[in-house]
């Protein structure tokens, strides 16, 4: 992130953003598509920098709101400083990582590990959360099936939260609700 060459600095900062937040990489959209963004398509209006924090607020994939605040300390201080530099002379509607696309980010990842992409890296981050969560429960193998299921669901929930996934109502929800209602309303017949 301290590269003197501006393009490489922007790519490295976008990659760090994905690492730090598990944000999707982002792609260009057609004008008729919803205005959702990811790392490479963030605009100045989507972040707020204070002296000590980086605040994100925007609509991500499927129109799910993404809000996150990162303290500007440790490695995040350099991240903060880079973002501050990138937005310094930009209008609210201008992209932070101008000239950088998902292709640039994926090419960078692939130069480190063959076939690595932002999507695969994000999956790795989520898997790491699940793995850590399960490792934190040393005696899970001796637990009941119900407790194992609880820990597995809890680990998956932590990964989903990190990735900003939100549950959606299933397409067949209305039909299942009616089925449940009819089942409960059916009166027993006399024998």
Where are these regions (language model features)?
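Conserved tyrosine-mediated DNA breakage-rejoining catalytic core shared by Y-recombinases
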Residues: 42-68
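Extended alpha-helical coiled-coil/alpha-solenoid scaffold regions
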Residues: 7, 75-80, 162, 170, ...
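Conserved small/polar residues in nucleotide/adenosyl-binding loops
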Residues: 183-189
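Short, basic (Lys/Arg/His-rich) helix/loop patches that form interaction surfaces
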Residues: 85-95, 103-122, 126-175
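Basic, alpha-helical nucleic-acid-contacting "clamp/cap" segments
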Residues: 59-100, 108
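Hydrophobic/aromatic-rich, well-ordered segments within soluble, folded domains that form packed cores
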Residues: 30-47, 129
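Basic, Lys/Arg- and aromatic-enriched nucleic-acid-binding interface segment
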Residues: 1-37
């Amino acid at each position: 992130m301290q590269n003197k060459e501006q393009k490489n600095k922007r790519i490295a900062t976008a990659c760090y953003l994905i690492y730090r937040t598990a944000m999707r990489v982002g792609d260009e959209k057609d004008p008729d598509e919803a205005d959702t963004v990811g790392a490479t398509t963030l605009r100045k209006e989507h972040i707020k920098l204070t002296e000590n924090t980086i605040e994100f607020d925007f609509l991500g994939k499927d129109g799910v709101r993404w809000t996150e605040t990162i303290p500007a300390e440790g490695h995040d201080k350099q991240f903060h400083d880079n973002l501050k530099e990138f937005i310094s002379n930009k209008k609210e509607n201008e992209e932070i990582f101008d000239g950088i696309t998902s292709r640039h980010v994926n090419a960078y990842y692939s130069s480190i590990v063959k076939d690595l992409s932002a999507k695969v890296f994000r999956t790795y981050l989520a898997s790491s959360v699940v793995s850590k969560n399960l490792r934190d429960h040393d005696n899970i193998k001796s637990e009941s099936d119900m407790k194992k299921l609880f820990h597995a669901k809890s680990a998956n929930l932590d990964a989903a939260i990190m990735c900003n996934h939100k549950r959606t109502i299933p397409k067949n929800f209305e039909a299942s609700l009616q089925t449940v209602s009819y089942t409960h309303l059916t009166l027993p017949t006399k024998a």
